[in-house]
Amino acid sequence: MDIFKVLSRGIKAQPKKNQPGAPQLLPSAGAKVNPQFFHDNVGGANAKRGKKRKRKGAQANNATESGDEDDDASDVDYFAPKPTPEELAAKKDAELKADEPKKQKPKLLEENECRQILKSHRLKFTVLAGRVPQDEAATEEKPPKKQKKQKEDRKKQEEEEKKKKKKDEDKKQIYPQPLNSFGELKYTYGIHPVLADNITRQGFRVPTEVQMGSLPLQLRPEMALEKATDVEDVKVEKGIDFLGVAPTGSGKTISFLIPAIDAIIKRRAEDYTPETDEHVLQAIVVAPTRELASQIVNEGRKLAIGTGVRVVLMKRTLRLVAESNEQEETEQEAKEEVQDSDSDSEAESEPEEVMKIDEEEEEEEESDSDAEKKTESRAKGDQKFKKERPITRVDILVTTPKILLNFLCGGEKEKGKPRIIKKTLPTVQSLILDEADVLLDPIFRKQTMGIWRACTHPNLGMTCWSATMASNIEALLTKHIDKRAKRTPEQTPKPLIRLVVGLKDTAVPNITHKLIYTATEPGKLLALRQLLHPVSSADSGPPLRPPFLVFTQTIERAQALHDELKYDIPLEAGGSARVAVLHSSLPDSVRSKIMARFRSGEVWVLITTDVLARGVDFAGVNGVVNYDVPVSAAAYVHRAGRTGRAGREGGVAVTFYTKDDIPFVKSVANVIAMSEKQAGKDIDEKDTVKAAQGSVQKWLLDALPKVAKEDKRKLKVRGVESRRTGGKATITTKSSWERRRENNRREAIEASKRRKREAQKAQKEGGAAPEKAEEEWTGLD
């Protein structure tokens, strides 16, 4: 018998929600000390670490020296006067110098140690293409064994061996050196000291998984593979082509900017003469949206402070140093490129998210500043003005595909004619594709391939980055890299190395996923209002707190949802200014202001389409709401990746689905299940504790129907069809009578305008005065 229960039987227990508890972790609380997603214990030499033992003599002295930093942390003078700005600056410089280890010969890890570290962080390197075949004479040294089997069995065995050998040769796994800290970049991998100081000032200490694996291979591939065995056929003297597949928010932008800036600094130091130009275009970064391109430019300029490297965003008024291309060769290449794109697409249709991104790019180009519009209008009437426009000196160019291709082709595309590349960029030695799966999708593929063909440097390096990468995109990259290598047979082909972090095409494991059934469209609106105004703590999992993003399927639905929610936040908390909508039909200046307000915390709820689903970094977003089910598993991965950036914990991704969504929601449920498996929340129907931790349980996965291939294709192209036609799927709280009244009035006004236009047209054609029309109906009052 529990005596406490007996004595407290008549006392009402205090609710749990009022009891003080541990503070909740949120992405908006600040950066995490360790931004890494994975760190498994794989045993081996590192398994014995952490056991304390007594030390004597020199060992004790070494231990004392290594623990100085920990002792200093507890030696704090709480009554010291406030330091002056000069003292703060001197202290900061001293900390920077203290972080620099003494320059010494780099110590490389053995392959077994590299294998354990890479495995603990779930890093997998694979050589996809570019391996040099070994001499056949060396492989045929051993005499063939006598076989007493029939010819048919021998042929079958040989065919199986060839298939197995070809499969092993096509994809070979390697174990390069990992990057344990950013301090190794300066002395081990020899990056420029100014660049290393900029990295330290930006607060980078512990590398993420993608930075740990990709930076050594990109900076010094020979050193990264020095201790690796069985890599004789992987020739990296001329560099490598790289394909990085890593979770959202894992630092992919820094992973390709650091090697690009460092390579430009080194080439400038080697080739510098007083006659040469200081700024030569050597690297191009291609991104699908203008917001993402602007973000990359900002990050690049922070890293390039004091290095002399210029990072510029491409605009229509920009002039670059380019060479003219021969017309015949370009037409032939354009035809080949069109045929390759048609054959590689395999009757694939454009995903809705890509179509929206393309629409956004066109809107951005059309909605440039007034000064640029005046410049363009003057340039149309005065060809001399175009020639007098100065050439922009740039080292790294960040651009969207269409605007750069228009510059290379000399104008907009004409209908029915293939794009003719009139200019080439022979100085570009590095082409970087951010969100490569979108840029190589059918709708962007021709533009991206045109830029790729315009970069004619024989030693061009290619790097591609994304959180999702389909196998057909990898095959397309391999095919075109091999084709480009065959054009220069005198050079050793660069190997194409792929890095996969964690499980491929899965969402980030450090956030909570929720799949909520709302039955109908009005149920979605009610559920979203409950998230804005939580009334009960009965719901399992962490609550969703602002700021957060709300994704819808179409622009019309985003605008309608904004009209419904803009008065839901009380005036004391900021009112309608706390809710905003952003989509591709808004002008560029308006979108920039909304983005700035959301980053500064003025906007708490940002309603948008898939335009903001990729690449854009919002460090403090606490959650994501998929008001409409994503059109694909990849779309869900990128939407959910707007929270939980850089390892921040506490983010929430909520997905609403109705009865109409049940045939399509299984792909999203599978992604959530795989993400929870990475986080250790394995689905187990026998273990009720594990089942309670996961948001997608075993019975739900079994009950949801499988999505057919044709349904997936239709969903990518059009989304859920009922939401495009309106009707019952309209986002509104108005009654059907009110909506019918508004529609009748709108149609009556349109009919009145149409009759007036017809009357004016008849008057112009006939010349006679029109008869007096009957009194027009103006609709219901």
From Swiss-Prot:
Task: Indicate yes or no for the key word Disulfide bond.
Answer: no
Q: Where is the composition biased (Basic residues)?
A: 48-57
Point out the signal peptide segment. none
The UniProt record lists the EC number as 3.6.4.13
Q: Which GO terms describe its molecular function?
A: ATP binding; ATP hydrolysis activity; RNA binding; RNA helicase activity
* Compositional bias (Acidic residues): 66-75, 339-369
User: Does the UniProt entry include the keyword Kinase?
Assistant: no
Give the similarity note: Belongs to the DEAD box helicase family. DDX52/ROK1 subfamily.
* Self-association state and partner proteins as the record states: Interacts with the U3 snoRNA and is associated with the 90S and 40S pre-ribosomes.
What name does this protein carry?
A: ATP-dependent RNA helicase rok1
The organism named in the record is Neurospora crassa (strain ATCC 24698 / 74-OR23-1A / CBS 708.71 / DSM 1257 / FGSC 987)
